[in-house]
Amino acid sequence: MSLMTKLGFRALVASCLITAGSAANAQVNVLITGVGSTQFPIATANFTNEANLPQQITSIVRADLARSGKFTNIDAGSTPVPETASVDLGAWKAKGANAFVAGSVNRDANGQYKVNFILYDTVKQQSLGGLSLTATDTTLRTAGHKIADYIYQKLLGVRGVFATRLSYVIKTGNRYQLQISDSDGQNARIALSSTEPIISPAWSPSGTKVAYVSFERKKPIVYIHDLPTGRRYMVSDQKGNNSAPAWSPDSNTLAVALSLTGNTQIYTVNANGGGLRRLTQSSSIDTEPFYSPDGRWIYFTSDRGGAPQIYRMPAQGESAGAAQRVTFTGSYNTSPRVSPDGKLLAYISRTGGGFKLYVQDLQTGAANAITNTNRDESPSFAANGQYLLYATQSGGRNVLAAVPSDGSAPPQILSVQGGSVREPSWGPFMQ
């Protein structure tokens, strides 16, 4: 969420933070370009039998690799090449491709698609294996993303995030929509539509649920939405405000910020809505909890030192150990997010009258701004830790942007066809 001169928790200001857009349907297009100084050249031939499919597998694979900023697509021509073909790898190397992909799509008697592909290293003149996937008309895109993930991991040694999903809130006219999309912003589905603000979406570690805060009952209440079934249920409707849900790594618990006794404090609640337990015991404002990936710590924002800073405490609460301050660069830091490997902390820092996304090495304490935008908020790591998604402003609009988490390239604004978009959350690896 956005930031205030006096730190408060996010639910109170949601209605003034989310601005109106003009389009009835908004589409987010995710692009990350120019990552690093070297891009891997790869040629992906058209898969056989895909010309009349509702989704072109090779188009999805090529687009995924290109938007990652890590690959350059070499023209593979228009002739389909199946995975069973004998391939002249030397010829593809001569064309500038260090890797080559061939594949096929075949429909079986049940109407399902069998998608097969093989990846070659043209430099070492060897196969790097492949996958055999089953898909339907509605999951062909997912199959394409999984192929791109396989290629990314085999060639770069890091697990790809193309088959992950995003959640975000779009406001068009007077209506708010919590949308779930593929990692490229395509295939967006509406999880919730409301005339009242929706904020703070947070993915469960399994990727099957999203917790969020809705104002539909004229106050902030925490809900969980089960994506496979479409069922949703209330988790926290305590006296006062209920805000900032964050999942524990085992999915059993949510940390939340509640003003149950006055000042906002951090609590935990079971994912079924029971077992409320207070964790912080300060006279200050404690908010924006976030679990470390090993579940040992909860990072949070507090003004207990006189100005907002990031602290961490044992996941059992301050009764198990005193909270420790984590951020020391800058006088105003909020919105902590820990990378999936537990090594980096992303947060928002007020600098020069604006707000920038910073990344801090949790071992050394070194912190650096990684964006050139100036109204940053709501950072969210990709599941592989390689990228950060965040909300910012560009051209007077609320937009999303993506940036490498090491700051190796400038952020890229994500294209939205109308509307105001914010509150991004990047989902985990699919189980």
Curated annotation (Swiss-Prot):
Residues 406-431 are annotated as: Disordered. InterPro entries: 6-blade_b-propeller_TolB-like, PD40, Tol-Pal_TolB, TolB_N. The Tol-Pal system is composed of five core proteins: the inner membrane proteins TolA, TolQ and TolR, the periplasmic protein TolB and the outer membrane protein Pal. They form a network linking the inner and outer membranes and the peptidoglycan layer. Gene3D superfamilies: TolB, C-terminal domain, TolB, N-terminal domain. This is Tol-Pal system protein TolB. Disulfide bonds: none annotated. The keyword Cell division applies. The gene is tolB. Keywords: Cell cycle, Cell division, Periplasm, Signal. One of its GO terms (biological process) is cell division. Part of the Tol-Pal system, which plays a role in outer membrane invagination during cell division and is important for maintaining outer membrane integrity. It comes from the Bacteria. It comes from Burkholderia orbicola (strain MC0-3). It is found in: Periplasm. Residues 1-26 form the signal peptide. GO terms for cellular component: periplasmic space. Belongs to the TolB family.
